[in-house]
């Protein structure tokens, strides 16, 4: 099966090309922290020769608790994103939750993200598609990989074929997630070769049924990321934080920023090895 390539300037995102790191922080906590985190990612990815897209949310609209930090909002968030682009020359991905956000966000960032909880909301999907921007679709935790083809079709019916699919884990009973690596290939097939990326940090979430925030399994981020890249995919979606224990959102799943270079170095080695192998047709 031929793999589709998404081109963003000099970036080429595809399942059969060197992996792209979609990395940053969960939510914009401040302008200064965003600058520091982005600078570290740029330093590491430039040193290791890894294609890079900065990620962060300006509004976490689906927090568990009404009291949880959501972010600076769209207006302030877009100002920060523009400064990051001007300063570091990075491509940026962020999520939208409302139809009115689609056009102004797509005018600043390079990839707009359809959140997992909203991935079947047709009006939102259509509004995003009509911007013409590249769209990253998060697979809902409650949806099988095969059903992602229907979401891709909605986007393509609006005249937009610039689609990336992202796995962020699947419900395993109550308050737990697992990752089905076989689903990566299924998503490639039902989308006719769309790039598939793996959100390793969100896949490590654990829900506290009586708490106001998610827990996580940060200690397992390296082994899960290794397994995901071993399948042969287009990219890795990763959140890192200078002080994960005091992060305003999903700290228990975030990689300590100080370990970023060692982590990305391992991931590049695995991706290079896997993609050096010839494909073996075992379907006959």
From Swiss-Prot:
Main localization category: cytoplasm
Pfam family for this entry, one: DAHP_synth_1
An MF annotation (GO) of this entry: 3-deoxy-8-phosphooctulonate synthase activity
Pathway: Carbohydrate biosynthesis; 3-deoxy-D-manno-octulosonate biosynthesis; 3-deoxy-D-manno-octulosonate from D-ribulose 5-phosphate: step 2/3; Bacterial outer membrane biogenesis; lipopolysaccharide biosynthesis
InterPro entries: Aldolase_TIM, DAHP1/KDSA, KDO8P_synthase
Gene Ontology biological process terms from the UniProt entry: keto-3-deoxy-D-manno-octulosonic acid biosynthetic process
Keywords: Cytoplasm, Lipopolysaccharide biosynthesis, Transferase
This protein's GO CC annotations: cytoplasm
EC numbers for this chain: 2.5.1.55
Annotated signal peptide: none
Domain of life where this protein originates: Bacteria
Subcellular localization: Cytoplasm
Catalyzed reactions per annotation: D-arabinose 5-phosphate + phosphoenolpyruvate + H2O = 3-deoxy-alpha-D-manno-2-octulosonate-8-phosphate + phosphate
Family: Belongs to the KdsA family.
Protein name: 2-dehydro-3-deoxyphosphooctonate aldolase
Species of provenance: Mannheimia haemolytica
GN (gene name): kdsA
């Amino acid at each position: 099966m031929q793999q589709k390539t998404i081109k963003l300037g000099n970036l080429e995102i595809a399942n059969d090309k060197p992996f792209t790191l979609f990395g940053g922080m969960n939510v914009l906590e401040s302008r200064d922290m965003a600058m520091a985190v982005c600078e570290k990612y740029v330093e590491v990815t430039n040193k290791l020769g890894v294609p890079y897209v900065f990620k962060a949310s300006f509004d976490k609209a689906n927090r568990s608790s009404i009291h949880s930090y959501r972010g600076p909002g769209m207006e302030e968030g877009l100002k920060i994103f523009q400064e990051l682009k001007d300063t570091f020359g990075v491509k940026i991905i962020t999520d939208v939750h409302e139809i009115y956000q689609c056009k102004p966000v797509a005018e600043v960032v390079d990839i707009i993200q359809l959140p997992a909880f909203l991935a079947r909301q047709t009006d939102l999907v259509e509004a995003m598609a009509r911007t013409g921007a590249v769209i990253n679709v998060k697979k809902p935790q409650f949806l099988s990989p095969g059903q992602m083809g229907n979401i891709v079709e909605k986007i393509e019916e609006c005249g937009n074929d610039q689609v990336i699919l992202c796995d962020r884990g699947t419900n395993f009973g109550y308050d737990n997630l697992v990752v089905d690596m076989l689903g990566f290939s299924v998503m490639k097939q039902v989308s006719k070769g769309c790039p598939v990326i793996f959100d390793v940090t969100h896949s490590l979430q654990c829900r506290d049924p009586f708490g106001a925030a998610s827990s996580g399994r940060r200690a397992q981020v390296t082994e899960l990321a290794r397994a995901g890249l071993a399948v042969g995919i287009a990219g890795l979606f990763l959140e890192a934080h200078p002080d994960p224990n005091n992060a305003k959102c999903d700290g228990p799943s975030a990689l300590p920023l100080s370990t970023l270079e060692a982590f990305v170095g391992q991931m590049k080695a695995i991706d290079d090895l896997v993609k050096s192998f010839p494909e073996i047709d075992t379907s006959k």
